[in-house]
Amino acid sequence: MVNKNLVGRCGLYCGGCRIYRAYKDSESLRQSIAKRYKLTPEEVRCEGCQALNEQSWGKGGWGKNCKTVKCLNAKGLNFCYECENYETCERFEKWASICAKIGVNLRENLAMIKAGRVEEWLRQEEKRWTCQNCNQPTSFDLKKCHWCGTKLKRNR
């Protein structure tokens, strides 16, 4: 069964986020992120964009402090594609270009979500961000699997 909390409101798959993976999978990854951001390991936690709360990650512009989430909440919207400014939004375009560098097409993802193909999309993303060696979930930005240490091959 897929976890719908991992449907990012901008079209990003939250299951590939380093914060989410550290919180769910790896105490050592959680500790290294905590050290980097001068936090306690307990503060490195997130259940995905659909489940943000006061205990969620909030360092910088991520998680509960995400400007996209705040914008959508202020407009009473769930996803970027619902906004009348979606096609011309500078914030979205900037984020989409960053995501494109790791092989993520936010517009394609949002099109699948809009078409009601959320579960199909979540299954595809889960498979895409899984280590080919140990079959465990990994993060977008890791070069090696945090489970088995295998160099990750990405389908971009």
Where are these regions (language model features)?
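Hydrophobic scaffolds flanking metal-cofactor catalytic centers in soluble metalloenzymes
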Residues: 1-81, 85-114
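Short cysteine-rich clusters marking metal-coordination/redox-active sites
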Residues: 46, 80, 131-134, 145-148
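Broad hydrophobic/π-residue packing in well-ordered secondary structure
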Residues: 86, 118-124, 144
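Short Cys/His-rich micro-motifs in 6-15 aa windows
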Residues: 88, 149-156
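Ferredoxin-like iron-sulfur electron-transfer modules
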Residues: 119-137
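Active-site beta->alpha loop and helix N-cap motifs at the rims of alpha/beta catalytic domains
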Residues: 135-138, 152-154
